[in-house]
Amino acid sequence: MPLTPPPDHTKVLLVAAIGLSIVASILTYSRNTLPQVGDHSHLLPHGGVYKDGTKTIVYGGPRKLNSLEGGFNLPVQPWFLVILLSAAIFLLSCRSGHRRVCGQCH
């Protein structure tokens, strides 16, 4: 009875992790966190004017789409901080001249 190595599921798990990360980032970025204006039958999420016999709503519209988007202030943006820290870690790890090698073939 020959010994066989267990199946390698690392590629499947890597693809699943990347897919879940993409889905989570899209859901986070596209989520609407602005307050709703209007009542249950008249919503004005993008601004506008509604006039009824007894009711008038004037809403100028949102200034940003969600809580993650705000102006062009890069140091405050979460995605910019992630990219900046990743680049710093990569550059610092490449600059070190010595590599750790255990000396065994794997």
From Swiss-Prot:
GO terms for cellular component: host cell endoplasmic reticulum membrane; membrane. It is found in: Host endoplasmic reticulum membrane. The keyword Manganese does not apply. Residues 31-71 are lumenal. Keywords: Host endoplasmic reticulum, Host membrane, Membrane, Transmembrane, Transmembrane helix, Transport, Viral movement protein. GO terms for biological process: transport of virus in host, cell to cell. Residues 1-9, 93-106 are cytoplasmic. Its main location: host cell. The chain crosses the membrane at residues 10-30, 72-92. Belongs to the Tymovirales TGBp2 protein family. TGBp1, TGBp2 and TGBp3 seem to act together for cell-to-cell propagation. TGBp1 is the main movement protein that physically cross the plasmodesma with the viral genome. TGBp2 and TGBp3 would facilitate TGBp1 function. Plays a role in viral cell-to-cell propagation, by facilitating genome transport to neighboring plant cells through plasmosdesmata,. This is Movement protein TGB2. It comes from Chrysanthemum virus B (CVB).
